[in-house]
């Protein structure tokens, strides 16, 4: 049985997407990735057909009056309400709260699997970016079954809706393109999963 997450390009793509959603664009983790995506050539290395990526190459390079840092602040930090909150429990919990039941279920799963993952201070573990970084770490450490459980049970049940809203409301060419790249890539991964994706009701 071969897991798609055993492929080298899985962990690279998961780490790139995770870092760009989780870290500020000027951070040491994300700045080199922003530089790569705003130049030609990255699409030849991405694990999707180049034809499907061609519009994104142009979009990533499109200029905007709003800087990348300003857009990231608006989309992921605030102070105003975030247009598409990146935490799973906001979508999966009836009250749309942080640290909801779905976050607790993720924590329980992590404990059962012996997974320790360092988060920013007092932030829920179910951030879209951190879940991708965790998936990359699991894949890199040969834990393919846990990687695919994480995706099927704790990310894919809400990520499509999150990305649809994120793309619709991003209002910045780089982050709209990033949302599109994530949506295409996660759809490809989901089509290759060996276990079914959990069906969970969404509340926004």
Curated annotation (Swiss-Prot):
One GO term (biological process): chaperone-mediated protein folding
InterPro entries, A to Z: DmsD-type, DmsD_chaperone, DMSO/NO3_reduct_chaperone, TorD-like_sf, TorD/DmsD_chaperones
Disulfides per UniProt: none
Keywords: Chaperone
Superkingdom, natural source: Bacteria
GO MF assignments: signal sequence binding
HAMAP family associated with the record: DmsD_chaperone
Family: Belongs to the TorD/DmsD family. DmsD subfamily.
Cited function: Required for biogenesis/assembly of DMSO reductase, but not for the interaction of the DmsA signal peptide with the Tat system. May be part of a chaperone cascade complex that facilitates a folding-maturation pathway for the substrate protein.
Name by which UniProt lists this protein: Tat proofreading chaperone DmsD
Primary gene name: dmsD
